[in-house]
Amino acid sequence: MRLILLAGLMLSVLAAHAQGVSGTVVGRSNDGKEESIIGAVVLWEGTRSGTVTDASGHYRIGVPPGAKRLIFQSINFVSDTLEYSGQTTIDVTLREATIDMGAVNVEGERSATYINSRDPQQFQVLNEKELCKAACCNLSESFETNASVDAAYADAITGTRQIRMLGLEGKYTQILFDNIPAVRGLSSTYGLTYVPGPWVKNIYITKGVGSISSGYESMAGQINVALKNPDTAERFHLNAYAGSGGRTELNLVVGPKKAEEHEEHEGHEDHEEEEEHEHHEHHQHIKGSLLAHAAMSQLRTDMNEDGFLDNPLFSNLSLRNEWHFDGHSGLGAQVALNYQNINTVSGQLDYNPTDEIRSQLWGVNTRTRRYEASTKVGYVFPDKPWKSFGSQFNALYHDQEGDYGFQSYNGEQRSGRVNLLFASRILNESNTFTTGFSYVFDDYRDTLTSNFPLIVNNPPYALSRQERIPGVFFEYTLNARDKFTMVVGLREDFHNVYGALFTPRLHARYSINDHMTLKVVGGMGYRTAVLVMDNVGMLASNRFIVIDGDQAPSNKYYGLDIEKSRNAGLVFTWKGDIRYRPATLSIDGFITNFESQVVVDYETPGYVYFYNLQGRSFSNSAQAELQWSPIRRFDIRMAYRWLEARTEYREGLRDRPLVNRHRAFTNLAFETRKKANGSQWRFDATVQWISRKRIPFVISNHGEHDKEPLSSWSDDYWQVMAQVTYVFKTNLELYVGGENLTNFMVHDAIVMGNETSSSLFDGSLLWGPVFGRMGYVGLRWML
């Protein structure tokens, strides 16, 4: 019955920019009062496609092919330009212009990170200003100044960084690059390191389940990374970085020559567009961008004096080439190509895989090659901008080899994805929908060999597998002006092994008044486990790996269930003024319950078990965050987050390992007034407190059990990071910074580190930093 309902609603074909955008334009006066703006101009940058807000400040506009930036303008208010990456709702608050009559300069303010309170999804936006507050060498390091996402090392040896949202590992967060699912499969842990920070334009962080048009895999959250492209890339951007840990980087962004500034577009009335259309020939426009990244580190350091490298030695080359085609009559296309070549070495301090003697030491040597291509094609009806078709096509090949001490891993992934969408409205602009079809193909071929053998209770189970998943979906949006917005999504997928997967989701927003908003989020999510790469930190040990799936004959991969969860959240947002200065308070709570899960059990020393959940597994999260600008150019962001993440192990219901229950966070940012030549100083500091974490039962470095009968707890600790940037002029910046300024280190991060041939050798239970105080310097040059 569900299939009949969805198939009847689905109109098939095509998507990337396949839906309209609606929202409200609000003006905020200097005394803090807000009211909707009537007649505000809303238009797409570089086009003549625009509209104006109605008597309620509301607008709706179609999305032309290649559209990336939406401009908002109104008399007596500072214009604003927002990035578009597939949102259905974009709301904006324009500030009353502050005019210096002597210099005739108009100044506006824009936060480095902000919460969109008018979109029914609860998402936070991190822009380039926020990303520049830290070194942000790659995407996995871009969340150091964010309270909603935890970033930590997966183990004490490989240097792999992973994220957590709502107390759950990053594998439960769907990560998109330009609205295309990207970090999944064999890249589920390493994938965030594949994207250099200077390539990123914006990051959109969604707590809870995301839109069903992107698939069923978002369980704890969704992160959409908007990469620089031909529409948003600088004409030339060079970023050079060097750190005291031996890491050096060079990043290059090259974009097309920019068109005329959008301020020159005036009087974009519809009748003018029609008249000019009769006298101008249709034209086509092709533009491209190139993103390049090269990095390496060959400095051997051991600051915590445990005999192992603090950070891996590595070399990395990444390239991205993207082309946009903007045709006439509403047709457009985008093509992007990606390449990564990454090599890493870590382990004992003198380990060298190419040396006959030193290669006998315990070490890790990995080699990764990744090729990816994606295409988007869209069509918007010229006379019906609210009606559009679109398509996304994505293909990748991922090849990874690795020696991990006594174990060797080889993995290949061949994946393809098609997403076809149609968007339109029902009766009027308040009722819109998006429907479509998707097909996902994954072919995994991975093997793990070891002197400490892989143990599988039923030998026919193999690590290699193939997934074929067609699916259909329908998403309805009700937008009752500025008061209430609701998005209801239904999705049905058909997995070749796990059968039908039904995914309902709901996002609703209610505006209590001009300052307070309430949101409700709920839905389901699924994923199939990729045992080795989901848990690559376990290879930083000599643990025996035991896959203990169902004993009865089954087609399930490894005899393990598909992971299935239900997520619900409630979000309250207040936007107003404190002492006549803008402030935002956000309070949220989320509950995630697993109906089925692959439990990863480290509770027995020397072993790691994989088995189906037999009992409860859940995560409860609550967070409060305050953003305030007490004076112009000075921002304060404070947050507190509480977590309760527990799973039923064979030993009973216990806290999930290495998850801190409490985290307190403060970020301070100040910049001086710009001089006539554009020069200024910028200062940023972040302080955070991380509470203790549960460490699974281990053997001490002296070969004796810990004093506590089943587990131990880490210490809590503080971390401080800071950065100073000097802007010589508008296109040249020098920055100097430091991380872990408290110099806190874990000195016993590796269990039995002096007995690397023991089955009890274990570097997989890292709970804090192993590298002490670190300084860095960098340069940004933009044209």
Regions found by a protein language model. Name each.
Residues T89-T93, L139-S142, R161-R164, L176, ...:
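N-terminal periplasmic accessory domains that precede
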Residues S140-R184, K201:
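Extracytoplasmic beta-strand/coil segments of soluble accessory domains associated
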Residues Q284, G390-N394, H398-E401, S511, ...:
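Membrane-embedded beta-barrel scaffold of Gram-negative outer-membrane proteins
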Residues W689-G703, T725-L783:
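C-terminal beta-signal and adjacent terminal beta-strands/loops
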Residues Y59-G62, I180-G208, L319:
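Short acidic/polar hinge/loop motifs at secondary-structure boundaries
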Residues N30-G32, I38-E45, Q73-F77, Q87-C132, ...:
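Short, acidic, small-residue-rich periplasmic hinge/interaction motif at the N-terminus
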Residues S297-S318, H324-F389, A395-S415:
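Flexible loop and strand-edge segments within Gram-negative outer membrane beta-barrel domains
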Residues L585-N593, N612-V698:
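Gram-negative outer-membrane beta-barrel transporters
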